[in-house]
Amino acid sequence: MSYVNELKSKHGGLTAHIVKTEKFKTVSLIFKMLAPLTKDQVTKRALLPHVLLRGTKSHPKTAGLRSYLDELYGTSVSADLTKKGERHVITFRLEIPNEKYLKDQTPLLEKGLQLLAELVFSPALEGDAFQSQYVAQEKRTLKQRIQAVYDDKMRYSNLRLIQEMCKNDPYALHVNGEIDDVDDITAEQLYETYQSAIQKDQLDLYVVGDVDSNQVQSAIDKYFKTEERTLGMIENNHADEKVQPKEVIDEEDVKQGKLNIGYRTSITYTDQDYPALQVFNGLFGGFSHSKLFINVREKASLAYYAASRIESFKGLLMVMSGIEVKNFEQAVSIIAEQFQAMKNGDFSEQDIAQTKAVIRNQVLETIDTAYGLSEFLYQQAAAQVEIPIEDFLANIENVTKEDIIKAGEKIQLDTTYFLKGTEGAS
């Protein structure tokens, strides 16, 4: 059974991924720009998509752009940022109603592709720079976005763990950049960053919906003019050397302690034992039937929440938990016990089957939405590999208990980070 009908084609420096499906009443256009993560560029790149969404050459005023979106039957457009290991990804999303369901015959798909191309390739400029008013306004918003991470202690403690684990790596950088670097960005500098990104980034466009592939490809050729580029090879930059575990404790005015523990897995998305790592994580802390949830949260009542997740491009496994400050030692100890139990193979065939079923359902739920489907496929484009969804699911299904234990042998404790409250914290 084939879950996805993905047609790939090259258009200059852009790879198009047309996913024909009758599942959705809308068509999703998802444009991605991927580049190395660097301290020098990350804050500018975080600002860039939000400035681009303010106006285009044809619609230089934001209000005019919004009313044009309304004319296209309420087409919506948004942007966000993610990290894939040591790479930074800018995503633009445009969702349009499928013209097949409209009474009149407006060529909405072509207009949507034209608008997306215009947002990315024909921005509103002042000379050789972005419009200074838009840059100033979006700089303020970006600072608020960065500050929001510091105000949300769950996200902040995760950031601090990564900063400590990956001190000398680009991965330590936050996806939105550094708050201290925002003020210095000029409209001219931002335009230089933009020009470099358009010329050098890996560009991928996903078109998901009930569409005609030939029509989409000719519209891409017409509107998305990009030059061919050489993409850098993807290096597995996970460390295989022996890790020296460390403990870092911060103190702030928080009521609930945040205990985050980071491990090095030495396994990334393209590795053969990645499916075994996924099952390992599912058994350890990925789901509500996992060891962390049952033993740390339910049985010992030590945590408000306890879960784990893997970073599939950097080779990390991270435990997140919220605990009473007084329970720090006990929580660290019981999490270590659960981790050791995993390494010892202290789980049944029934546990494995249950975990595989949950992973399978999770994947099928993900690809049941246009955005989830494009994200799943983009994991592969970013990693420069091709694994059909049916193969991905079969690889999970074929994982044995021995495979899980073997994957566990590679995992090493790296950093224990604790954010604890000051005395009398509210």
Swiss-Prot record:
Pfam families: Peptidase_M16_C. Keywords: Metal-binding, Zinc. The keyword Zinc applies. Zn(2+) binds at residues 50, 138. GO terms for molecular function: metal ion binding. InterPro entries: Metalloenz_LuxS/M16, MPP/UQCRC_Complex, Peptidase_M16_C. Belongs to the peptidase M16 family. This is Probable inactive metalloprotease YmfF. It comes from Bacillus subtilis (strain 168).
